[in-house]
Amino acid sequence: MKWALTCVLLLAAPVAASAQAEDPAAAVNAFYSVYSGQHAQGLCIPDATVRLRLQPVLSPRLNKQLATAATAQARLTAKVKNAVPPVLEGDIFSSLFEGPTAWKVGSCQQKDKAARCSVALSYVPPPTAGTKAKPANWTDTLVLAATPQGWKVDDVVYDAGFAFGNTGRLSDMLNMVIASNP
C-alpha cells in the first residue's frame, strides 16, 4: 500500500509543478511570499543571505544583476569608508520606500517566454499612540521570464508615481549602481 501511495505521489508531483510553472500569477505570489519576510530588514540591495532566499523566485539574470550591484555597492562603501549612504535605499522591489505589507496579483499578460503582472500593493504603517495609520496603496508591475524551472521574477516596473518613490525599473536602478562603482 505504501508503495502504491508513493507511486501516486511521484506521478502527481510533476503535474503540480508543471501547472505552477505555467502560471505567472503563482510565480508572483511565490515571490511576495518569500520577499515579504525579507524587506522588513531594511535592506536596500539584498545581502548574500537574503539573495540566497530569493534565488528560487528570481530569474538567473536578476539574481546575477543583484549580486553584481551588491559587489559594486560594497566597493563604494569600502572606498569611502562608510562616509556616504548606500546608492539605493529602502525597498528596491516596490515603488514605496517602506515596501508593501500586503499584495494582490492582478491581471497577467503573457507573450512567448515573458509575462507582465500588475500587482496591487499596500503599506500600513505601524500604529502610533492615539492615531490611526493611513495606508498607502499603489500598483507596480512585475516582469517575469519563463525559465526551465518555471516562471521567475525578472524585473519590477515602478508604476506608483510617488513624489519620493522609486521610478523606472529595478534593472535600470541596479545598472546605475553597477556603472557608478565599477
Predicted regions and their residues:
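N-terminal signal peptide c-region/cleavage motif recognized by signal peptidases
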Residues: 12-16
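Surface-exposed, charged secondary-structure patches
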Residues: 58-131
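Extracytoplasmic/periplasmic, Sec-exported soluble proteins
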Residues: 20-24, 42, 46, 132, ...
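Hydrophobic/aromatic beta-strand elements that line small-molecule binding cavities or substrate pockets
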Residues: 105-107, 139-146
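Core segments of small alpha/beta cavity-forming domains
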Residues: 20-84
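Bacterial N-terminal signal peptides that target proteins for export
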Residues: 1-7
